[in-house]
């Protein structure tokens, strides 16, 4: 009996050995001759060049071959996405001394849809969903840069949660409708962001109807969008109304002027679910406000309804926009709730997955290239495997872990 | 030599003719004879140790003198009789009680074992008491009542054991035995060297790698004597001397009586069996526990590093710390990314669950690694169960250790 078990074990051991001796190399991208854009310290000659970049900086030309590779966003286009970017990303880019984004599959999928779109139809809605930190926001940025190159007008809400929470915020009763509430500071901020993203395109656009602010102040027919924005920035009281005016004019003129309008809303579920008791916005009577009562949210919701054409709405749902006890799942139907799902339905869901092994390796290699990973063990195959295991190949998690190495 | 009586040895010894060893030989022989002549009393006791219970069956030869019984002996005999009577009745009670219990449980009284008794007691008298020692129990009386040392001297007041006056007869006779064996080995060595057979001695020394000497506590229990630290050291030194002799493997059985196996040796049996599934994929199953969590881990080889924990992947653990816990066995065994694991884990919190999975994973991985890696894993502490548990709250205190705030008034 003992002998047979011994025999069995030894045979297993030999089989195991044969498997163990097979050293499976991690499959990386093959090196390509890509230019070195950075002004950072020059690479040493003897260092092997790790393939993690592509020289194709035009996001419109990215194909499936580029998936997992980093491309450099030129300075002038960086200005477009910069204002809407999370400070965390900006800090990372500053540390790396260059602004690079990874080409991901969902972005390509989205671009494929946009290329084949018939703009005459009512606005189609795309909804990105995925785990926390899987790259939904950067996918949006990738797409925005793409559309910016194509000359689209971009209407971008970087983080919808900002408009429904905060106990320190100034909340004013709307000058347009008394049962609605304005957020003057947020509206002004958004106007600046809108102006920065569409620099040079707004002066040609004129209003098509008259808007009366007060008895003495009004915007005549034919006022340029620039002027509306300037007015909103100088008279904060009307900044929310200015946002409403701009959005309405865009909806009306998109078809007549032949515009292409890209509406991007990050963490759209903030529009449809109630934020928690402590930090939800409150009016002067300390009454908690529903998202729909806030004029900014109200106006943006109109942009998401299929009542106009020559536009596209791309949204992302995120767990962070929901209350802490409503973050069990990351699917749109769970995060949006009944109301949100009905409002956005029908939409095209796009899943943003965590990194594949190739993408994760490319990311780690990029960090090594940027000296973000300095630990020698982190540069070995085993170290990379451990990083991938602990982070579970989640991009944000990987970045957090690598920050300590 | 055989014709010389033990008493003659003494004479020889007192003369200067014979060596001391001669005395040793005879004394040892006498010791063995003594052991053979005496039978073991209380042999029904489960762990009856012959060192403890040595007592003669009436061996006193009829003498012309009137038998005088010393006072101490008389007192002892009374005590012993009382003890014996008590134990006899207890044993009878226990046997009857066991039969009753078997009848209550509707089982055959003749084949009712101690395990059945334990099960029956737990069923009939369920107890929620925290301390297991405080719960009702029914066991052989010899296990429950403290043992009593049998009389060490006969009716005439003469001690049975020839080392009685050393106070620690068992201890010193053990030392004696060791010395004797060592001397014998030395003789043998001399003889082999004289016959030029040194090459036969290769590999004849005892391998101490997988075991260690019994602890002082264990030695005390084994000898039933109050052995001190100093005496224990003396014992170990002597044993070391025996074990390091080039021919010590000949006395392996004797040496192993005084040694306990290390964990690694026990582990050999703990390696899970490898099953081969359809498609030639091997898998091994093991379980692990930590705190109050239990995990059953099934490891597949070859794999690609996929984890399935209660139907989720590694996101089952939200914190990196817990994933790192799982990482360690894979890194130490060098199987990271080469195996898949299917985990069923229940109870407890994330720390306990991660620890339980780690233990189960390490045990399951044993099936796929080499001997040296197994040893490495053991040394890393992967195969050791973390015995810590939540400590109970005590009455009159705020928690397990914390006291209520003390207020003067």
Regions found by a protein language model. Name each.
Chain A
Residues 2-123, 301, 305, 404:
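A short, basic N-terminal segment
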Residues 256-336:
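Sensor-1/coupling segment of RecA-like P-loop NTPase cores
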Residues 84-92, 168, 219-228, 339-344, ...:
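Surface-exposed beta-strand-to-loop junctions
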């Amino acid at each position: 009996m003992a002998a047979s078990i011994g025999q069995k074990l030894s045979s297993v051991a030999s089989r195991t050995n044969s498997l163990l001796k097979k050293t499976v190399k991690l499959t990386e991208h093959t090196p390509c001759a890509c230019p070195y854009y950075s002004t950072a310290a020059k690479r040493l000659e003897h260092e092997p060049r790790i393939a993690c970049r592509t020289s194709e900086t035009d996001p419109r030309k990215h194909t499936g071959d580029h998936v997992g590779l980093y491309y450099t966003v030129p300075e002038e286009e960086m200005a477009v996405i910069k204002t809407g970017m999370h400070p965390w990303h900006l800090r990372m880019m500053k540390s790396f001394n260059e602004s690079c984004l990874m080409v991901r599959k969902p972005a390509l999928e989205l671009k494929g849809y946009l290329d084949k779109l018939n703009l005459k139809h009512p606005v189609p809605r795309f909804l990105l969903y995925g785990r926390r930190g899987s790259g939904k926001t950067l996918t949006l940025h990738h797409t925005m840069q793409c559309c910016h190159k194509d000359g689209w007008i971009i209407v971008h809400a970087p983080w919808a949660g900002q408009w429904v929470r905060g106990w320190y915020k100034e909340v004013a009763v709307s000058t347009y409708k008394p049962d609605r509430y304005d957020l003057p500071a947020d509206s002004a901020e958004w106007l600046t962001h809108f102006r920065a993203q569409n620099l040079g395109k707004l002066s040609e656009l004129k209003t098509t109807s008259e808007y009366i602010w007060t008895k003495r102040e009004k915007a005549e027919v034919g006022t340029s969008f620039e002027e509306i924005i300037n007015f909103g920035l100088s008279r904060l009281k009307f900044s929310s109304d200015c946002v409403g005016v701009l959005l309405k004019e865009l909806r009306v003129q998109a078809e007549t002027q032949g515009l292409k309008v890209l509406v991007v809303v990050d963490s759209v579920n903030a529009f449809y679910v109630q934020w928690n008791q402590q930090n939800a916005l409150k009016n002067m009577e300390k009454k908690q406000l529903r998202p729909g009562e806030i004029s900014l949210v109200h106006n943006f919701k109109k942009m998401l309804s299929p009542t106009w054409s020559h536009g596209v709405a791309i949204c992302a749902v995120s767990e962070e926009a929901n209350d802490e006890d409503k973050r069990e799942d990351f699917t749109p139907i769970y995060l949006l709730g009944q109301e949100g799902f009905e409002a956005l339905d029908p939409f095209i869901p796009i899943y943003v997955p965590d990194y594949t092994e190739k993408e994760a390796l490319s990311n780690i290699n990029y960090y090594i290239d940027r000296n973000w990973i300095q630990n020698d063990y982190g540069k070995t195959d085993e170290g990379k495997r451990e990083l991938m295991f602990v982070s579970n190949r989640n991009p944000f998690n990987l970045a957090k872990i690598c920050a300590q190495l | 030599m055989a014709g010389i009586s033990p008493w003659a040895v003494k004479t020889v010894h007192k003369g200067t003719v014979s060596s001391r060893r001669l005395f040793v030989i005879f004394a040892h022989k006498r010791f063995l004879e003594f052991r053979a002549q005496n039978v073991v009393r209380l042999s029904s006791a489960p762990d009856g140790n012959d060192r403890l219970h040595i007592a003669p069956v009436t061996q006193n030869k009829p003498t012309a003198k009137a038998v005088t019984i010393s006072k101490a002996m008389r007192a002892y005999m009374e005590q012993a009789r009382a003890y014996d009577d008590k134990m006899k009745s207890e044993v009878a009670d226990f046997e009857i009680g066991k039969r009753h219990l078997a009848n209550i449980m509707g089982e055959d009284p003749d084949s009712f074992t101690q395990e059945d008794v334990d099960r029956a007691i737990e069923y009939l008298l369920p107890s929620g008491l925290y301390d297991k020692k405080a719960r009702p129990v029914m066991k052989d009386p010899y296990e429950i009542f403290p043992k009593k040392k049998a009389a060490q001297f006969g009716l005439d007041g003469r001690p049975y054991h020839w080392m009685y006056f050393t106070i620690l007869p068992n201890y010193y006779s053990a030392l004696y035995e060791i010395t004797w064996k060592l001397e014998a080995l030395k003789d043998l060595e001399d003889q082999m060297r004289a016959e030029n057979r040194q090459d036969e001695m290769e590999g004849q020394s005892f391998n101490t790698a997988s075991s260690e000497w019994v602890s002082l506590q264990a030695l005390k229990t084994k000898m039933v004597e109050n052995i001190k630290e100093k005496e224990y050291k003396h014992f170990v030194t002597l044993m070391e001397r025996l074990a390091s002799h080039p021919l010590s493997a000949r006395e392996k059985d004797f040496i192993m009586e005084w040694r306990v196996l290390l964990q690694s040796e026990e582990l050999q049996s703990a390696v899970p069996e490898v099953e081969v599934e359809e498609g030639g994929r091997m898998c091994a199953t093991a379980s692990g526990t930590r705190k109050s969590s239990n995990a059953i881990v099934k490891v597949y080889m070859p794999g690609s590093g996929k984890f399935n924990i209660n139907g989720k992947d590694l996101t089952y653990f939200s914190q990196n710390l817990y994933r790192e816990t799982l990482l360690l066995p894979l890194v130490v065994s060098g199987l990271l990314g080469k195996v898949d694991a299917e985990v069923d884990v229940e109870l407890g919190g994330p720390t306990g669950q991660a620890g339980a999975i780690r233990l189960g994973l390490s045990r399951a991985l044993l099936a796929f690694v080499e001997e040296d890696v197994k040893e490495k894993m053991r040394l890393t502490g992967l195969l050791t169960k973390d015995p810590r548990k939540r400590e109970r709250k005590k009455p009159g205190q705020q928690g397990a250790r914390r006291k209520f705030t003390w207020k003067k008034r």
